[in-house]
Amino acid sequence: MAGYPLPIKHLISELGKLPGIGEKTATRLAMHILRAPEGDARALADSILEVRDKIRFCRVCYNFSEAELCTVCRDSARDSSQICVVEDPDALMAIEDSGSYSGTYHVLHGVLSPLDGIGPEQLKLRELVERIRESGVREVILATNPNVSGDSTALLISRMIGPLAVTVTRIAQGVPMGSDLRYMDRMTLSKSLEFRRGMEKEP
């Protein structure tokens, strides 16, 4: 990268900060942007700025939204007695794409990961408990990924809401251990929701 002008180096460096993008891929993307028509390059830059300026968290479920409430929370046809707890908006969209769920969601924006410095305070857990207390929720479906961090987070949530009068369920173990909900096919995801199992709550 030593021979590139400084603006190109900066672009490669910024692209390289994206997940899964190494220096070679970042360089290839930078070259593509440089060779693209000016209108395309500006449209890309404008889209990035638009996302940063216009997207916020839904005040109810913490999904991404352009408005105070996301499209799911604005939909009066959704079953508000169910909350499906997911790690991130990507998992929410995967479940929506499966067409197998008609309730509401709560997005944690992460899972417990002590090595990464992520504890309960960094997740939307307190907001979840408050939401359950203040609404007529009857079932909380824990749809964190089936791995150590996801299972630990699900267990903590089940303990936190133990004193509340709600049923707590976990997506079925037909979902392979260590897999990611974002990349599952629709049928597998649909079945994991259909055959979800109850979790014991601590008083």
Curated annotation (Swiss-Prot):
Pfam hit, one: RecR_ZnF
Keywords linked to the UniProt accession: DNA damage, DNA recombination, DNA repair, Metal-binding, Zinc, Zinc-finger
Domain Toprim: 81-176
GO biological process: DNA recombination; DNA repair
DNA damage listed as a keyword: yes
Entry annotated with the keyword Metal-binding: yes
Chain ranges of zinc fingers (C4-type): 58-73
Domain of life, source organism: Bacteria
Record-linked InterPro entries: DNA_Rcmb_RecR, Rcmb_RecR, Rcmb_RecR_Znf, TOPRIM_dom, TOPRIM_RecR
SMART domains documented for this protein: TOPRIM
Molecular functions per Gene Ontology: DNA binding; zinc ion binding
Family (UniProt): Belongs to the RecR family.
Job of this protein: May play a role in DNA repair. It seems to be involved in an RecBC-independent recombinational process of DNA repair. It may act with RecF and RecO.
UniProt-recorded name of the protein: Recombination protein RecR
Source species: Syntrophus aciditrophicus (strain SB)
